[in-house]
From Swiss-Prot:
Entry keywords, A to Z: Cytoplasm, DNA damage, DNA recombination, DNA repair, DNA-binding
Record's protein name: Holliday junction branch migration complex subunit RuvA
Subunit structure: Homotetramer. Forms an RuvA(8)-RuvB(12)-Holliday junction (HJ) complex. HJ DNA is sandwiched between 2 RuvA tetramers; dsDNA enters through RuvA and exits via RuvB. An RuvB hexamer assembles on each DNA strand where it exits the tetramer. Each RuvB hexamer is contacted by two RuvA subunits (via domain III) on 2 adjacent RuvB subunits; this complex drives branch migration. In the full resolvosome a probable DNA-RuvA(4)-RuvB(12)-RuvC(2) complex forms which resolves the HJ.
Chain residue ranges for the region called Domain II: 68-146
Source organism phylogeny: Bacteria, Bacillati, Cyanobacteriota, Cyanophyceae, Synechococcales
Covalent S-S links between cysteines: none
Region (Flexible linker): 147-155
Function description: The RuvA-RuvB-RuvC complex processes Holliday junction (HJ) DNA during genetic recombination and DNA repair, while the RuvA-RuvB complex plays an important role in the rescue of blocked DNA replication forks via replication fork reversal (RFR). RuvA specifically binds to HJ cruciform DNA, conferring on it an open structure. The RuvB hexamer acts as an ATP-dependent pump, pulling dsDNA into and through the RuvAB complex. HJ branch migration allows RuvC to scan DNA until it finds its consensus sequence, where it cleaves and resolves the cruciform DNA.
A GO biological process held by the record: DNA recombination
An annotated Gene Ontology molecular function: ATP binding
Main localization category: cytoplasm
Domains: entry comment: Has three domains with a flexible linker between the domains II and III and assumes an 'L' shape. Domain III is highly mobile and contacts RuvB.
CC terms in the record's Gene Ontology section: cytoplasm; Holliday junction resolvase complex
Length: 224
């Protein structure tokens, strides 16, 4: 049973609504389905470390990859529920962050769960009945969901900075140049973090475009 893989990306793929990556691990290519929201990172990274869930069937083996181990472990809990297959499990983790999904299940918020495509009210209620007393470990011991939400917000800002770093690096800028120029964003971390967490995907893209223009202008000034 494969539990974890580290390797070099060969290419990314898309089949219908499913997206993933092929990893070269010791000369063997592993085809792994990812959460769609992880594909942007897959496009720019050459090396991956993924937590894996493996499903074996008569017609072949499927691998599902997750950047964080708690995503993989919650995925396993979700697909243990009768009537929920791996594609619905992936859709739920695409729709929600782990603490948000755990919170919805523990608080019996079936209407929130039905936001996920493929989840009707009956399946949402079954998910709640079967899992609501099994997810304590995902709340990080004694931490509250509210504290976890703060962690998510900080993590979102960190991922946002990572994305900008990768874009600048792909444009040929070196580490020291990038770290210095990114300070114009990190100096206002609290303000920018709040903006990110209250913005739609389109607004986040506009914010990133604005920040990249500011950074590139600053970098061009240094080279003149």
């Amino acid at each position: 049973m494969i539990s974890w893989l580290k390797g070099e990306k060969v290419h990314t793929w898309k089949i219908s609504s499913r997206k993933g990556v092929v990893l070269n691990v010791g000369g063997v290519g592993y085809e792994i389905q990812l959460l769609p929201k992880q594909i942007d990172k897959a496009e720019v990274l050459n090396e991956f470390e993924l937590w894996i869930h493996q499903i074996d069937r008569e017609d072949g083996t499927s691998l599902y990859g997750f950047i964080e181990v708690n995503q993989r472990d919650l995925f396993r809990e979700i697909i243990s529920v009768n009537g929920i297959g791996p594609q619905i499990g992936m859709a739920m983790l695409e729709e929600f962050e782990v603490p948000q999904l755990v919170n919805a299940i523990e608080n019996k918020e079936s209407n929130l769960l039905t936001k996920t495509q493929g989840i009707g009210k009956r399946i949402a209620e079954r998910l709640i009945v079967e899992l609501r007393n099994k997810l304590q470990r995902f709340t990080d011991n004694d931490k509250t969901i509210h504290e976890n939400k703060k962690g998510i917000e900080a993590n979102q800002f960190s991922k946002y900075i990572d994305e900008i770093y990768l874009i600048l690096n792909s444009l040929g800028y070196v580490d020291n140049e990038i770290k210095e120029s990114i300070k114009i964003i990190t100096i206002n971390e609290k303000e920018n973090s709040l903006l990110l967490n209250s913005s739609s995907a389109e607004e986040k893209a506009e914010l990133m475009d604005k920040h990249l223009k500011e950074i590139l202008m600053k970098l061009s000034e240094k080279t003149t």
